[in-house]
Each structure stands twice: as C-alpha cells, then as structure tokens.
C-alpha cells in the first residue's frame, strides 16, 4: 500500500481542526464529527487544547483512501506555536492549506505558504466556510493568486455562497467551457514539453492528459489546486478527497534500504517514559531493534547516542495500534529511547542536517515557582517540556537558582506554558517580563596564550595554547579547527577542549550567544600524568578562549524583521508617523486603488507592539505581516545579559580560585 504523510496547516480559526474531523468522519475513522467549541475533537487531545479551542501540539491520525494510507498531521494555527509546524514540515509528503472564505488570506497564511513553496512541498488549498455569512469565494481566490501563489488553479466553484445552501461545484470541461484554456495556459507556463503539445494544432489534448500533467506539476510544487467547501457541513469534501488521492505524491519507499527516520515529536507515556514519534523515510524498525540517534546542535555539531526499541506502535485507521515492525513511509511511536529529543535522526545519516524553516524564538523570559520549595519540580517539568520543544532552549537563570530561562515566540505561548506547568505538573509559576534575544559577533581576531605550571608558581598543571577568533562561513556557525598535530594531546583532551569551546561561547563578552566565530587551537602541551582532561574542560579552554575573544572584541546584534503593511489611503500618515516613532525603516509606499502597500524593516522587539496597534491606526482595515530577516548591530548602548552563576572566566584570578579551590 502506498503512503502519504499529509499536513493540515492554516491561520488560527480558519477551520483546520474541523476539516481534520470531517476527513476522519468521511473516511470512516470516527462515527461522529467532533466540535472544537465543545472540546470533542479527535486530534486536540490535550485538556488545554479543548479548553481554549486551539491546537497547541501536532497530532497524528490515519485513514485509508482505496489503496492509499494517509497519515494526517494536524498542526497548530497560532503563530506562537510555529515550532510545532516546523517539526511537522520536515516529515510531510504533501499539505492542505486551509483559508477562510470570510476572513480570506491572513498574515500567518502567507508565512505558511511561503515556506511550503520554498520547500517545494506539494500543496492543495481548501477555502473553508463557504456557508458562513460574508463568504466571498471569488474575492478570496483573487487574494490567493495575489498574495499566496500566482499558480493557483480553481478546481471547484461555489453556488449560493454565504448561505446554508452553499454548494461546491466541481470544475471541468463538462461544467466550465473555459476550463481547458484556463488550466492549459497555467500548466504550459511551467513545462516546455506540455507547452509544445498544448500549441500543437494537429493534436487536441485529452482530459486524461490534462489530468496527468496537473498531477505531475502539483507533485512538483509548481501549481496549487484550489477547492471550496465547508468543514462544518461536509460540502465540497469529496472534491478535496479526490485531489488528495489523485494529485498529491504518495510514497512507496524501499524497505530493503538502511533505516532512515526523523523524530518530529516526543511525548510522555503513562509512567513518565519518553515516547518518540518517528517518520520512517526508508528501511524498517521493530521492537528490540538497536538504533543509533544522530543529533545536530545549534552550532552544527553532530553527536551520536544509542538506544533500543522496547515497544512500537504504528498509526493505523485513526489511532496507534501495536505492531512488530514499522516500514518506510510509516509514522510510528517508539518506546525505549531514553535520551531521545525532537530533531534526532535515527539509523543511517546521509546528507546535511535539516535546517530551520522558521526563525528561532526572538524573546526570552525567566520562570520562577511561586513557592521556592517547588524549584526542583519546576526544573524537572521544564526538562520534560524541553524534550518536547527544544526551541524553548531551557537554561538556568543566571541570577536565581530557583528560576529558569526559556525562549518564546510570543505572549500566548507564555500563557500556555504557565497553564501547562500548573495543570499538568502542579507547579504554579510567575514570569518576568519578556526580553529580546540578541547575539554577539566577533569584530576582529584575537590570540591568547596561557601557561600553567606549578613549578612557576601557577595554579595547576595545564597546556600552553593559542586561540584565534574571527569571522568564518557559513553564517551563525561556530567552527573549531586544529592547527596542531592530533597526537599532541590525548584524544580525550581534544574532545574536552572542543566541547568547552561550544559551551563557553553560549555567553560572550556581553552575555549573549556568540555566532559567526571560528576558533583555532594553535599550541598545546601536557605534563603527564598530572594534567587531566578536566583541566582543559574547566579552566584552560574557558580562560584562553574568553581572553582571545576579549582581544578580538564582539558586537551585539539585535534581531530584525521585514514587514509588509497594507493601509487605507486616509490612514497612511498616522501609520508612517508611528513607524518613525518606533524606529522602523519603511520603504516608499505604493498605491493600489484606495490602499497603500508598504514594506520595510524594524527591530523584532517592536513587532508585537506594532501589530497590536495596527487595528486602531487603520480603523480595523490594515493588514500587517512580519518575518524574521536576520540581525543588525544594536543601536546605542549594547544590551547586556547577566552571566551564569559561578566563576566568571573574564576574571582570570577569580575563575582559577573558584575552579581549583586554591590560590
């Protein structure tokens, strides 16, 4: 049986989870369609999801269409949970992007479609809520072509839009006399061979040839079929199901190839054990199999660790069922991988590590328990949540051991995190105000040398070496290079030094993560048997690295976002004034009828505040879209983040005193 891993994506409240329910009902998986408002949906299983009526974590359900097994992945719609969407994108074969026929194309819709197109993921568009008052299918189709993709092709139309009688009508040669021309011209734009056949007057293309070319170009992500319907009533669902079965590319991967799988979700079982969700790309996986997990950290380093599968479930007909083996194309739940994390790749590692599709969180906050004696429970709970969502980048609070620092996309995510800790772990917490996460970049090259030898009245046996810090490629990487013979130190010492380089550069001269930095080890020495790898890990590496970094100097960079803004002509002046007040850099406005479009950049820290002001500034008619676009040097006094508790490697004497417990 062929398999299709299908993602359902949408702006919040477009009806994504309702569509998932309707698909599961249509294919016989569930007897009754659940309601988001009533908290009875299949994929929103968390209590918080049911209470708030939003999807917070990706969920999997399975149905069968003839000889096609579809693993349906329902993803969050709110932008604060974009990291869940990112993890789902990495395992998809195709997607359905849901758009409301009333609200139309929203900012989050545009971000999602840009990413789907950039990744080449075959995508169908489903315009939902055609039966709701205010539905405007023709206008939304124009928005899709103007704002999402010019290669949108409508395969259905709507009669009696905006009423309970709304109907979806399939478009084709029998119902639309212009269908062949409209579809043929679009397909000819993307394929020269089809263009030649289309223009050949001696050969009239058949309906089958049009259908085959449409399927081929949809599978390549070149065109995007659009369907209309209502998840509430089920109208138009048959057309969408036909598109899923006939237009999206299914997988029939080799089971004889080496195992390759990706962990895209981690849950906890009833006894607190880790449960990994894996999408198998090739090969097979079964109970009692030994597995090698490959993990890529934020600097690009790859580490390996082993695990053994103690139990395995494969998704079949709605929910996971016990199986002995999962095969290529399956999504499986695996028990026994104690050290598993989201993003790990299992089995054979080939090709570069997966890159991030969306920007990392640009905000961070400090969490503290309301009752100090619950600090241990708080940290244990946060470690479990960090396994499930590594983007929160959990670390110890530098100023208070009872607290912890996490990274966030927005205030809604912070609210959900607080509710999760209270309701799932019994720990009530308070948050500090959020702050923007900056980075540091070296501005020059620095060298340092430290010789530590008790015979010269220094503090411990160590190694003389030099570290240079400069700007390498690729961007945002930390690279560690050897300019010495590998045998100049025991291998454990080299590993200790490299590990320490990466951990030390999490806090630069101003306390921020250092990026775009190359570190070169140019001299080494060891006096056996007194020197130990821990000497290099605790002191030598940190001291000499921070000394070299100080000589090179660093510059703090703040995150910056690009923005697009649509403003009624009458409200352009106050909007420009507010942008100037906030320190944004707008471009030249362009007029389109009675609306002005404006592009520019602004510090990411201002995006949330400005987005909240747009309705008031534009009398409810403005549209604002912002995306992370990188970093730029911070203006004015560089912001400083407190360093971790403990000895400060920027103060050599203090650091040695604390690390070695002697003078």
Curated annotation (Swiss-Prot):
GO terms assigned for molecular function: GTP binding; GTPase activity
Residues binding GTP: 10-17, 74-78, 128-131
Keywords: Antibiotic resistance, GTP-binding, Nucleotide-binding, Protein biosynthesis
Record InterPro entries: EFG_III/V, EFG_V-like, G_TR_CS, P-loop_NTPase, Ribosomal_Su5_D2-typ_SF, Ribsml_uS5_D2-typ_fold_subgr, Small_GTP-bd, T_Tr_GTP-bd_dom
GO biological process assignments: response to antibiotic; ribosome disassembly; translation
CDD domains: Tet_C, Tet_II, Tet_III, TetM_like
Every tr-type G domain range: 1-252
Family from the record: Belongs to the TRAFAC class translation factor GTPase superfamily. Classic translation factor GTPase family. TetM/TetO subfamily.
NCBIfam families cross-referenced by the UniProt entry: 47473_otr, small_GTP, tet_protect
Role: Abolishes the inhibitory effect of oxytetracycline on protein synthesis by a non-covalent modification of the ribosomes.
Name the UniProt record assigns to this protein: Oxytetracycline resistance protein
Organism: Streptomyces rimosus
